[in-house]
Regions:
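C-terminal motif of bacterial Sec signal peptides marking the signal peptidase cleavage site
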Residues: 20-23
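Acidic, contiguous N-terminal accessory segments
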Residues: 25-27, 66-75, 79-172, 208, ...
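Feature activates predominantly on carbohydrate-active enzymes
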Residues: 113, 121-124, 128, 164-360, ...
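Structured mid-domain segments that build the active-site/substrate or prosthetic-cofactor binding neighborhood
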Residues: 299, 303-306, 314, 420-528
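Catalytic domains of carbohydrate-active enzymes that cleave complex glycans
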Residues: 500-653
Length: 653
């Protein structure tokens, strides 16, 4: 179980010697600091790697407090698995030095009364340093060596200058006068800096909501001349998968920075990119009408404009922390268009695209609110019939164009001009990049038609994020299975996508190294069986359906019969056997559970190629595992049937 870490606060005399402690506002005004202290652990390490299951619901957890020693109980319904991949001495990290000084000699300094996200990340720094080294613990005495988190009274001119060079929600890590500083341009950046230090030096891997791993390292030296600064490429990063969407801690660890679905107060997470009201398909709601797909308003009707403008102001007034207001078309099916009245059509014909009338409308909204709501952007979609950029109209400076890739192929990279679907999208993004300073992307990273089918897009994820970076994209929204936990690779895919958004400059080799590391620690010793499954089905899928979209059913990617007209039972059974072997090789019950949950996709594959009786048998297995692991949806907005009889099972086909 997690060890209870009690914070002790220095005596009044010591506080006076360090400087009177005051609060720090959200503008990063320097404040005095509180010392958290260190000491050598006396815990007896175990001799073998452990998988520790902890429940914050029933455990005491440490909280950095303002001048008092306090133990707080945090409500949570999720158990976290912390796997310590230990050295021979039973400790994940035998030796950690900072600037040549052993970690045991360091104390932790954090801004008193500062943002909750900074103080929470300091809590986690203490927790994982103690777990990793068995040497970092709280002590009452001060030290000549400090780890300084955020804006404090320890700031030197060198630190202030380094902080000023940080952009967006990035951070800098550097040594100065015997202190290691981790600080950002904002509170959220400081939090991310702490998590990056834990990942880059301590070997912590925040793999999933329920799984954090400390990997084996014998010795780590943080050099005395360390000076690392990370400035994010994308100002907005949103990995829109279930755990990222609904668990703020998971999103924070992943460095996702949108908060429209968060129940956590914005200040507690250090701010972020937030929407006023709904974040997409808002045009009917802004007219006080119920949402209706495939129906669009007349964008040259003055009454429509004035009503939308009035409600835009109301939404912004009700959400003063929001930085974006979405004024976006209703969802629509392929081939559907917007208003076809003479006035709208005249603009569209002149601009060569229905985006003509939409962008005229959006620019007018943006101009009318810019003085009253400085720093707020109007977001609209380039989606379906509005995807093509207009000939002469350019987005206003406070307009965001969110270009959507829903029609694209996801077994070819978006930059691959040999793919006809992606060639057209490439032309569109190039046109938008030439006229738009605030270009966001809405990308699709899952199969919306069948949640249980392997989606063979892992080989293009790195390429596609590179593609966005190279076309001046400033924000990325990656839609995934957001309505339910998944029986495919939700945890792996969202982990890799978040890594790419935070660091799109990583090499392809680094991307695949992250993939292999995740598979190893999340699924256990049989991870190579799972990698073989992924590789085999990716190649098989490309062969039988070279252009995979997000609405393709499983049997289109993995046909029930082979080229000779025979059932593909051998392929599907071979793939299931790989999962069964991985299950047997998994070392812990948690890893076995991960394997079993993700094996749903293999049972569904067997269903695709089976006889009538076999199909029902495998679907019953799929259904049973979905019930066991709380999987509530089998496709986009389609919940699982409420029983496992044959009639209801047919809906899963």
């Amino acid at each position: 179980m997690k060890k209870k870490l009690l914070l002790t606060i220095l005596s009044c005399l010591l506080l006076l010697s360090l400087g009177l402690l005051t609060s720090c506002d959200s503008g990063n005004t320097p404040a005095d600091s509180t010392v958290e202290g260190t000491s050598t652990s006396t815990d007896t390490p175990t001799d073998t790697p452990t998988a520790e299951v902890t429940s914050p619901t029933t455990e005491d957890t440490e909280e950095i407090t303002d001048g008092t020693t306090e133990v707080a109980t945090e409500e949570d319904t999720t158990e976290e698995i912390t796997t310590e991949a230990e050295t021979d001495d039973g400790i994940p990290l035998n030796n950690l030095t900072i600037g040549g000084v052993d970690i045991q000699n360091y104390t932790l300094v954090v801004q008193e009364g500062g943002a909750a996200c900074v103080r929470n990340s300091a809590d986690e720094l203490i927790e994982y340093l103690e777990k990793a080294t068995a040497g970092f613990r709280i002590e009452e005495k001060a030290s000549d060596y400090e780890i300084v988190i955020g804006v404090t009274d320890r700031d030197t001119d060198k630190i202030k200058a380094a902080r000023e060079a940080v952009e967006l929600d990035g951070y800098t890590l550097l040594m100065d006068e015997g202190r290691l500083y981790i600080t950002g341009s904002c509170d959220r950046g400081t939090m991310y800096g702490v998590y990056c230090f834990l990942e880059d030096y301590i070997g912590v891997r925040f793999l999933a909501k329920d799984t954090t791993v400390i990997i084996n390292q014998d010795s780590v030296e943080v050099p005395a001349d360390v000076h690392t600064t990370h400035n994010p490429v994308f100002e907005m990063r949103d990995t829109y998968w279930y755990d990222m969407r609904y668990d703020q801690t998971t999103a924070n660890h992943a460095k996702d920075n949108s908060f429209y679905d968060s129940s956590t107060p914005v200040a507690d997470i250090g701010g972020g990119i937030g929407y006023a009201g709904r974040f997409v398909h808002t045009i009917n709601l802004l007219q006080d009408l119920p949402y209706q797909g495939n129906v669009q308003p007349c964008l040259t009707d003055e009454a429509v404009y004035q009503l939308v403008l009035s409600n835009v102001r109301k939404w912004l007034d009700a959400n003063p922390e929001a930085t974006i207001i979405s004024v976006s078309q209703n969802d629509s099916d392929p081939g559907k268009l917007g208003c076809q009245c003479a006035n709208c059509k005249a603009i569209d014909d002149r601009e060569g695209t229905p985006m003509g009338s939409l962008l005229t409308f959006i620019n007018r909204i943006a101009n009318d609110i810019k003085d009253d709501y400085p720093g707020v952007y109007v977001d609209t979609l380039a989606y379906r019939y509005t995807r093509k950029a207009p000939k002469t109209i350019k987005p206003a400076d406070n307009v965001i164009i969110r270009l959507c890739s829903i029609e694209c192929c996801f077994t070819h990279a978006l930059s691959d001009e040999s793919c006809s679907k992606n060639k057209a999208f490439k032309e569109d993004i190039e046109a938008w990049a030439a006229i738009c300073d605030n270009l966001y992307i809405w990308d699709y990273t899952y199969n919306a038609e069948t949640y249980f089918t392997f989606f063979p897009n892992f080989d293009v994820l790195w390429n596609n994020v590179q593609f966005y970076k190279n076309h001046n994209v400033t924000g990325v929204f990656l839609e995934g299975q957001q309505v339910s936990v998944s029986g495919e690779f939700a945890e792996l895919r969202s982990y890799l996508l978040a890594k790419l958004l935070w660091d799109p400059d990583m090499t392809k080799e680094e991307y695949y190294a992250y993939m292999d590391e995740f598979l190893q620690y999340y699924y256990g010793a049989g991870w190579e069986k799972i990698k073989e499954y992924m590789t085999t089905l990716t190649e098989h899928g490309k062969k039988h359906n070279p252009h995979v979209g997000i609405f393709d059913k499983g049997d289109k990617m993995f046909p029930a019969v082979d080229d000779k007209g025979k059932r593909n039972t051998k392929l599907s059974r071979d793939m299931l056997d790989l999962w069964l072997e991985a299950y047997e090789l998994a070392e812990t019950e948690e890893q076995k559970a991960h394997v079993e949950k993700s094996s749903i996709q293999a049972y569904y594959l067997c269903h695709l190629s089976g006889s009538s009786a076999e199909r029902i048998k495998y679907l019953k297995k799929v259904y049973a595992l979905c019930e066991k692991y709380g999987i509530e949806y089998y496709k986009y907005v389609q919940p699982m049937p409420d029983s496992s009889n044959s009639n209801n099972l047919n809906s899963l086909i």
